[in-house]
């Protein structure tokens, strides 16, 4: 399994979070895609034990508003 930032496949942006470290929102969102654990790191949700078949940030098809 990999680890990485949770990505919104429609925008290419990370899932934003403000409460760093232990973060219920990130834990829930990471578990939703089948990851083992999540926390807020650098204002984005970081997932551990990320399923290999799920996309993570950066998402090649979408640039999150950057050119």
UniProtKB/Swiss-Prot annotation:
Any single GO CC term annotated in Swiss-Prot or TrEMBL for this entry: extracellular region
Record flagged with keyword Ligase: no
Residue ranges annotated as propeptide in the record: 65-67
Protein name listed in UniProt: Toxin Cex8
Signal peptide from the UniProt entry: 1
UniProt superkingdom: Eukaryota
Coiled coil feature spans: none
Tissue specificity comment: Expressed by the venom gland.
Family according to the record: Belongs to the long (4 C-C) scorpion toxin superfamily. Sodium channel inhibitor family. Beta subfamily.
Gene Ontology molecular-function annotations: sodium channel inhibitor activity; toxin activity
UniProt remark on domains: Has the structural arrangement of an alpha-helix connected to antiparallel beta-sheets by disulfide bonds (CS-alpha/beta).
GO biological process annotation, one example: defense response
UniProt-annotated location(s): Secreted
Domain LCN-type CS-alpha/beta: 2-65
Key words of the record: Amidation, Disulfide bond, Ion channel impairing toxin, Neurotoxin, Secreted, Signal, Toxin, Voltage-gated sodium channel impairing toxin
Functional summary from the UniProt entry: Beta toxins bind voltage-independently at site-4 of sodium channels (Nav) and shift the voltage of activation toward more negative potentials thereby affecting sodium channel activation and promoting spontaneous and repetitive firing.
Disulfide links within the chain: 13-64, 17-40, 26-45, 30-47
Gene3D superfamilies the UniProt entry points to: Knottin, scorpion toxin-like
Residues the record lists as Cysteine amide modifications: 64
UniProt lineage: Eukaryota, Metazoa, Ecdysozoa, Arthropoda, Chelicerata
A Pfam family it matches: Toxin_3
Main localization category: secreted
């Amino acid at each position: 399994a990999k680890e990485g930032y949770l990505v919104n496949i429609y925008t290419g942006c990370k899932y934003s979070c403000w409460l760093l470290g232990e973060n219920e929102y990130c834990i829930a969102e990471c578990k939703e895609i089948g990851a083992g654990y999540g926390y807020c790191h650098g204002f984005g949700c970081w997932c551990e034990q990320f399923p290999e078949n799920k996309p993570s940030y950066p998402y090649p098809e979408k640039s999150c508003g950057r050119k």
